[in-house]
Every structure is written in structure tokens, then in C-alpha cells.
Amino acid sequence: DHFMDRRISKDLDVEVFGLSMQELESVLQKFGKVHAAGKSFGVLKLKTPTAEYDFSLPRREQKTGKGHRGFKIITDPAMSFKEAASRRDFTVNSMGYDLLENTLLDPFEGIEDIKHKKLRHVGPAFAEDPLRVFRAMQFSARLEFKISAQTAKFCRKLDLSELPRERIFEEFRKLILKAKRPSIGLSASKQLGVLNYFPELKALIGVPQDPKWHPEGDVWTHTLMVLDEAARLRTGIEKKDMVLMFGALCHDFGKPLSTKFLRGRWRSPSHDTDGIAPTLHFLQRLTDDRDLIKQVTSMVKEHLRPIQLFNERDRINSGTIRRLALRVRIPDLILLAKADYLGRKLTKKERECFEAGDWLLAEAERINVKDEGPRPLLMGKHLLKLGMSPGPEIGNILKLAFEKQLNGDLQTNEQAISWAKSNYPDL
């Protein structure tokens, strides 16, 4: 971080040579509370009133079985720094600083790779954890480094099929939330062989688009551009940004299924709804976060609506927008639609304004559904209070009342109750 002029992380990792685990623990206890939860991995955490630090002993890993848990940790205080650094993933992460000698330790020429903006693996130990392929993907984007040809070739040989989805998801999370240009990492995923494990992404490559609307090229190229535009629209609120960025990544998953050459040009008439199934399949292999999956699939399904509604604004009523607000949060949808709109080759003037989004946001604010969908005015408790007996008829009345509310015919609780009384005289 120092040599790349990046913000220095508050998380400090200190590797200690020449002390046993017991000796290290004894020394650290003089400065604060020591947590030994990572002791079996050769790591101790020191907590002081002002900060937390990770102290570790040099270690080597002995493979004992398959998967990322199939190894045994052996600490060795007598190990040289070069040998300890040889098990790191990339040369830029293999450097150290000798606090006693006040010198940089760089046995694998990480500084040279930083100068040339190159991401290069340290050595054969890279293969010990195939997750490093995904780390290459997200690091290449966050650092905006080019992956060396030798590293890419090495990555393509590794088996990624046994990696737990939680670990893969974390690398995707870092890619889409921390990189200014996530497209660099997505492009790298093609080079690294990652796309072989994600057919929904691979299917985007080569899918044609109408050059009138998409002069940038195929769906893959468009998706890369949309991803970068979405990154510029991130809010800093992680949950919202996750939905936006995964929505950008998945928004055109339906195009490989729906694209046809019709009436003289390439069209994808149902790609919004066709994208739901591949989006579900993709996300369920990454996470069990049902709320995230639900929100992203809804965004994919509705991503065309802002422009569609704007084009039909003289023919639609406010009920259409109220119903949309029940399915997605409108400001979030507008961000995705804006990224989709901007993710093309546009003139400077065309980029200045997303008129459809501005219009929809103003309409949503006007009818009070900008922040959430409308809540029913008439509820079961009102009908029971009016003397109606519990039963399925209550549900039918409430459903009809809510439809009238969405259409704008009922706007207050009093109007809703009055409507129920006048239409159901037995109440």
C-alpha cells in the first residue's frame, strides 16, 4: 500500500522470527489482551486500548487431504524470511519490512512488479489454495494491474470445483465493492479460466446486439461497461451496493436465451424475464443470502421498466408506478437502469442526463412511493371492527380494496373504510 500510494490499512500483520509461540505469547501479554483463537494456525491477536494486531510465526503447510481444510500447519521460528514469503500468493504481497534493521525485505521483486503494474504469483505454493485464482481476479481490478501470462497459465490449471461458495462470494464481494473498474477483474476471469465455472457469464461472450443501440459490441462488452458505470454510482451502503453491482453483473443474463435476428436486426424481446432463472442459478452457487438473491432477481426482471415507463408516460397511470414500487425500491432500480443506459458508447451530451430516471423518481416522489411501496389502507382489523366474521371473504375484500388503492381511487383510511361500508351493506 505504501509503495502504491494507497491508504494504509489499520490492520497490521507482524511476522515474528526467532521466538517460539510460548515466548511470543509471553511478550505480547505485557502490552494487552492476547487472543489465542488462531494459535493452531500460528497466529496470535493482540488487543490494546487503541488497536488490534495480528502476530504470526513463519509457517509451512503440509497437505493432508482435499479442499482448503486439507492441510496441517507447522510453525518454524528458525525459517528464513524468503522461505516464509515463498508461500504468499503474489509478489506484491510477499514483501516485508524489518523493523530492527529498518530495511525493506523483497526476495521476489515485488517492487519491480509494482513499478510495472504486474500481478505475478510467487511460486509453486500458489497452488496450495485455489481460491487465489479468485484473488487474482479481484486484485487485478482493485490494483488495476495486468496479470502475468505465467500466472494466468498456472491459474487455468487449478481445480476450483471444491472451493466453498462462501469463500468465492467474498472475492466477488471485494471485486464489485472495492474496485473502481470491476470490469478489469471480470475480463481477467476469462483469462484465468474462472468462466468455465460460471456458464451464465461465459454465455454472454459473442451474443450480438443491435449496433444502433449498442455500438460497443456484444453483451459481454456491454456488461463490462455497465459494471464500471454501476461502480461510479455506488452509495457506500454495502447492502444497497451489493444489489446494484450484482444487478449490473446479471442484468442481461437473459440475452443468450432470447436474442434473435428479427425484422432486420438483433432483438432480445424477453431478456428481462428470461434472465431470472440464470440469475438465480448464478447467485445460489455463491450465497444463501435469500434477501440479496430476491432483490437482485427483482432488479434483473425490472431493469427495463424506467425507460419503458418513460416512453409510455402519456399512456400509463400512477397505479403502474405504485405496483412497481411493491416489487423493487425505485431509487435503487433507477441506479441500475442508469448504469445500463450509460454502459454504451454515448456522446458527451447523451451522458449528461438520464431523463427516464429523473422522470420516474419525480413521479414516485409525487405519489409518495419513492422510499417504499404503498401499504394497505384497509386491513382485516377494520373489517372485524365493522362486524364482519373471520373468513376468506375478508381476504377477497382486502385484495379488491388494495387494487383500488393502487389505482388511486382510495387515498386515506377513511375513504377505504367508507368504500367497504358502501359496497358491503351487511357490515
Functional labels for PLM-detected ranges:
Residues 1-427:
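Catalytic cores of the polymerase beta-like nucleotidyltransferase superfamily
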